[in-house]
Amino acid sequence: MAAMTAAAVPATGSFQKQDEEWRAVLSPEQFRVLRLKGTDKRGKGEFTKKFEEGTYSCAGCGTALYKSTTKFDSGCGWPAFFDAIPGAIKQTPEAGGRRMEITCAVCDGHLGHVFKGEGYSTPTDQRHCVNSVSLKFSSAGSSQ
């Protein structure tokens, strides 16, 4: 499925499937993270150290989530972004208020967490800590 542009983000929650349908289209690791709110192993993700120009999309539904221009090396062991494409993610506070869960606004797939106020020299001082397995990447020169 081709990645969607920010202007083409479908309505929130509009891409729903039953677990058996998700299992048929996702790898076991993608299902564990996206649907069961799992976490990649620290430092092992495909996109942790990737800084090529392009767009990161949801591995579940193809919705464009992050531009590479918002990616930075936080040293946390997971891909880190300081901002998402407008309307592409949902943020839900977790108990204790230290972090917010982030999910795809279209398919509700678990992406990771947002941490605020950690002192990064980024425009937002936010760290969107995202599981690599939740993402697909399209380089700026590709047709997707």
UniProtKB/Swiss-Prot annotation:
One of its GO terms (biological process) is response to singlet oxygen. It catalyses: L-methionyl-[protein] + [thioredoxin]-disulfide + H2O = L-methionyl-(R)-S-oxide-[protein] + [thioredoxin]-dithiol. It comes from the Eukaryota. It is found in: Cytoplasm, Cytosol. GO terms for cellular component: cytosol. The lineage of its organism: Eukaryota, Viridiplantae, Streptophyta, Embryophyta, Tracheophyta. This is Peptide methionine sulfoxide reductase B7. InterPro entries: Met_Sox_Rdtase_MsrB, Met_Sox_Rdtase_MsrB_dom, Mss4-like_sf. It comes from Arabidopsis thaliana. Disulfide bonds join C76-C129.
